């Protein structure tokens, strides 16, 4: 949620952000107008309440016919107070509605444009030349079936399309990835968390998801709970309504199953486990002071790159364009791994700086210290998130490390988590 006071003081900054996102810049003016209407209606209500209190004293002192006349006026004034209170409430609600609809203010340097307007920041590693090696690469599903690692057919039988079983070395590989990521997180001061995967609507909305109109979210109607698409949601709600100490960043690593309906993905990635309804993910989540947010964002990206380096796959880092950031992010970097059979890069990780957007929605603050060290007021913290490992990484590992016979060489960094196994053999 945006800072309305800041928008009123610097409207052009918010107009520029909206334009970079390809969104309606006139929303800025509507917020300004709604805030003015709110202030005016509250002032009108408070003035009438003051008159009502003063009038009450006159009535108490009056007698006889004068008192009867004043009582009639009191009734009329009470009706006007009630009407003014209702108007003030409606004005507050209108401003809150606009405030919730307003995307986060992008940070300086974010490229303008939509999904295809990202900027490639770096490419690391060189894709293998399978033709020079003398064989045609198999895709991850064919490899997974040869290795007894992925079973889409039984996944569909049990649960429907876009579900799978990870079996044998497939299950072990995912667990190894998660443990490698968790060890990296522990090394860097993260607290491991296994969070709930069902959350209340206010928690989902607090992180920037629209529970009323987002077709990607699974809902349990009977209980009014939502299945999370990332542990970011539960971790963001962890400190909702609290005043935190973020003199040093507070870092959590959440390991959870995630669920996405993939409602807008008909016909896309129908083969294999690139786009599924259920997957596991290790997510980094950070609460930080506002001035530390950009540095923490850079660290999140660096940790993601360390993981990608550890699994030895070619990858690139892209700076996501403003129009593809989503509601909460002020800046987002994606790391995409090379997928040989598709001849392109596919997203494996994403890291977002949400500045104070989520904290404002969830009312998460820090205590401000004055120069002499005494307690001052409070202000919003910044929140950030980033992926350390997820089921989709299996795609990149299998395809990039395959051998001509269908076996797969295990990246050295994962071998300690697989009992020293150096190769996945055909079953």
Curated annotation (Swiss-Prot):
L-serine binds at residues 230-232, 283, 387. ATP binds at residues 260-262, 276, 347-350. Keywords: Aminoacyl-tRNA synthetase, ATP-binding, Cytoplasm, Ligase, Nucleotide-binding, Protein biosynthesis. It catalyses: tRNA(Ser) + L-serine + ATP = L-seryl-tRNA(Ser) + AMP + diphosphate + H(+); tRNA(Sec) + L-serine + ATP = L-seryl-tRNA(Sec) + AMP + diphosphate + H(+). It is an enzyme of class 6 (ligase). Gene3D superfamilies: Bira Bifunctional Protein, Domain 2, Serine-tRNA synthetase, tRNA binding domain. GO terms for cellular component: cytoplasm. Pathway: Aminoacyl-tRNA biosynthesis; selenocysteinyl-tRNA(Sec) biosynthesis; L-seryl-tRNA(Sec) from L-serine and tRNA(Sec): step 1/1. It holds the Pfam family tRNA-synt_2b. It is found in: Cytoplasm. Its main location: cytoplasm. It comes from the Bacteria. Consists of two distinct domains, a catalytic core and a N-terminal extension that is involved in tRNA binding. Homodimer. The tRNA molecule binds across the dimer. NCBIfam families: serS. HAMAP family: Ser_tRNA_synth_type1. Belongs to the class-II aminoacyl-tRNA synthetase family. Type-1 seryl-tRNA synthetase subfamily. This is Serine--tRNA ligase. It comes from Micrococcus luteus (strain ATCC 4698 / DSM 20030 / JCM 1464 / CCM 169 / CCUG 5858 / IAM 1056 / NBRC 3333 / NCIMB 9278 / NCTC 2665 / VKM Ac-2230).
